[in-house]
UniProtKB/Swiss-Prot annotation:
It is found in: Cytoplasm. It comes from Mycobacterium tuberculosis (strain ATCC 25618 / H37Rv). NCBIfam families: 16S rRNA (cytosine(1402)-N(4))-methyltransferase RsmH. Keywords: Cytoplasm, Methyltransferase, rRNA processing, S-adenosyl-L-methionine, Transferase. This is Ribosomal RNA small subunit methyltransferase H.
């Protein structure tokens, strides 16, 4: 059952509650916002969980999911996927966050010979993707796992963890499907169990963190993962409140947050719960640590000439991707030497100039793309590798 907030809210905050006007916002920080209808869209759209997607049934497959920058991702990765055959035959694409299957569908439709391996930690998402992509079943493998376990997933699918994949795609952050289901506890505008697990089979919930972590640990989570400037006040309030009765629902936590954050701060910057909910979700799902492991593993999994694209929706994720990518395109030759040492050349080259953003047209079509940052790399061949290959070929 959906319930309204039990208090009077200022105009700036009302935008995040049921029946309020639509407000475009950061995908993650606005993730708990209430459903509403996006005004004056040129395509049939509906807002679910604060994210605008196509009306269910309005698309050709009726799955109501509009993938972000799908065409641009296709353009960036296709050269690596068509280097054997124009239809993608013999190429392998790893979709590390398959979700509802929107990006995967674009690749499988556009490249009728392509093999795709899709990963997701959410079994519900895998069920949706399986239904959406059923016509490609002979070229599709789905694996229930986190993306930091992609090496094991590749092995399970019959591929090596190193140098076996031609393309890799990450679409990071919470999914609209997870937000749509109130019982998952991701949204702060409806009352639901304080859960927030992307994978319901894992043990740790948001309620466990809120009710058992000490004050210092809570403040650290809110500060690091939510960049919440009132982290200490909120943590202290949580500890005082739970001493009387444990937190069990999102509404109870939202009420505490509204009391803990000073009134002037509540009037600006959106809903007072948004940063705390983001922080708890990241902590519950170990999102940033998983990403720190997954991106280097993905780079290792790429074959020479292979390409990777990552879509990030908030600064914490993008910083990790940016740092790993910067290291990948850097030379290993010691600074100060006048020439590049053989075998010390960069392993990768950048395919994007910094982070690409969605165009005005893309944002108008799909407001969910507003905060996205897209980065892409290609694995390149060292001269030493090329010479070794030529020598081996001559010896054979």
């Amino acid at each position: 059952m959906q319930t309204r907030a039990p208090w009077s809210l200022p105009e700036a905050t009302l935008a995040y509650f049921p029946n309020a006007r639509f407000v475009s916002s950061d995908r993650d920080l606005g993730a708990g916002a209430a459903p509403g209808i996006a005004a004056s869209r040129s395509t049939a759209c509906q807002t679910w969980g604060g994210i605008t997607v196509a009306d269910p049934g309005s698309g050709p497959t009726g799955f109501g999911h509009v993938p972000v920058l799908a065409q641009r991702c296709f353009e960036l990765l296709t050269p690596a996927l068509t280097r054997y055959y124009p239809d993608g035959s013999q190429a392998v694409l790893l979709d590390a966050t398959i979700g509802a299957g929107g990006h995967a569908e674009r690749f499988l439709e556009g490249l009728p010979g392509l093999r795709l391996i899709g990963l997701d930690r959410d079994p519900t998402a895998l069920d949706v993707a399986r239904s959406r992509l059923v016509r490609f079943a002979d070229r599709l493998t789905l694996v229930h796992t986190r993306y930091d376990c992609l090496g094991a997933a590749l092995a399970e699918s019959g591929y090596a963890a190193v140098g076996s994949v031609d393309g890799i795609l990450f679409d990071l952050g919470v999914s609209s499907m997870q937000l749509d289901r109130a019982e998952r506890g991701f949204a702060y505008a409806t009352d639901a169990p304080l859960d927030m697990r992307m994978d319901p089979t894992t043990p740790l919930t948001a309620a466990d963190i809120v009710n058992t972590y000490d004050e210092a640990a809570l403040a650290d989570i809110l500060r690091r993962y939510g960049e919440e400037r009132f982290a200490r006040r909120i943590a202290a309030g949580i500890v005082r409140r739970r001493a009387k009765t444990p937190f069990t629902s999102t509404a109870e936590l939202v009420a505490l947050l509204y009391q803990a954050i000073p009134a002037p701060a509540r009037r600006v910057g959106g809903h007072p719960a948004k940063r705390t909910f983001q922080a708890l979700r990241i902590a519950v799902n170990d999102e940033l640590e998983s990403l720190r492991t997954a991106v280097p593993a993905a780079l290792d999994a790429l074959a020479i000439g292979g390409r990777i694209a990552v879509l990030a929706y908030q600064s914490l994720e993008d910083r990790i991707v940016k740092r790993v990518f910067a290291e990948a395109v850097a030379s290993a030759t010691p600074a100060g030497l006048p020439v590049e040492l053989p075998g010390h050349e960069p392993r990768f080259r950048s395919l994007t100039h910094g982070a690409e953003r969605a165009s005005v047209a893309e944002i108008e079509r799909n407001p969910r793309s507003t905060p996205v940052r897209l980065r892409a790399l290609q694995r390149v061949e060292h001269r030493a590798q090329s010479q070794q290959w030529a020598t081996e070929k001559g010896d054979s």
